[in-house]
Amino acid sequence: MSDFQKSFSESTSSIKFDEKYIDNSVQPNDIGVAEQWAVKTVADPCVGNLATPVNSGYFTKAFINNLPFYREGISPNFRGLETGAAFGYLLYGPFTMTGPLRNSEFALTAGLLAAIGAVHILTALLVLYNAPGKAPNVQPPDATVNNPPKDLFTRAGWADFTSGFWLGGCGGSVFAWLLVGTLHLDTIMPIIKNIWTAG
């Protein structure tokens, strides 16, 4: 013990706590609500990866592990195909309903082209992530994903994911365009367009 530590220890040993502020109902061995919900480290505490009730809860783990990016037993190409189809399908609606041509007769086609353009931009970003230099970052196991896909985080796996994402994104946009173009939605489309242009 250094001289500073000794002097500090001696100076603080005379400190007395006021008895009215001491809570005797809490004992060191009690396991209360705070202990049950305490945040624990997953692996190395210096990394800052913590197991909280949110990221290590049953619902969160089941939801995240069933997404196509983390689901076990599928190829990187199919992961990209499924992820891209969801992106393309979901991007079509906002581009069609809130785009600059929403009140014209070309709204459906403009939404399709805008969604496909957004899928192309996202695909270009995925290609840049796999650009020469550093290999894609391999995610270590954590509190939410116990077994991340190892075949995805290689150059070939990421390239397969990217090509599947492009194909799925374009296909999802075209599928949404075909669904909106059906006859039974012709009566609903003017109502939806009037909601967005009411302001």
From Swiss-Prot:
This is Photosystem I reaction center subunit XI. The keyword Transmembrane applies. InterPro entries: PSI_PsaL, PSI_PsaL_sf, PSI_suXI. The chain crosses the membrane at residues 108-128, 165-185. Belongs to the PsaL family. Pfam families: PsaL (PF02605). It is found in: Cellular thylakoid membrane. GO terms for cellular component: photosystem I reaction center; plasma membrane-derived thylakoid membrane. It comes from Prochlorococcus marinus (strain AS9601). GO terms for biological process: photosynthesis. Keywords: Membrane, Photosynthesis, Photosystem I, Thylakoid, Transmembrane, Transmembrane helix. It is a multi-pass membrane protein.
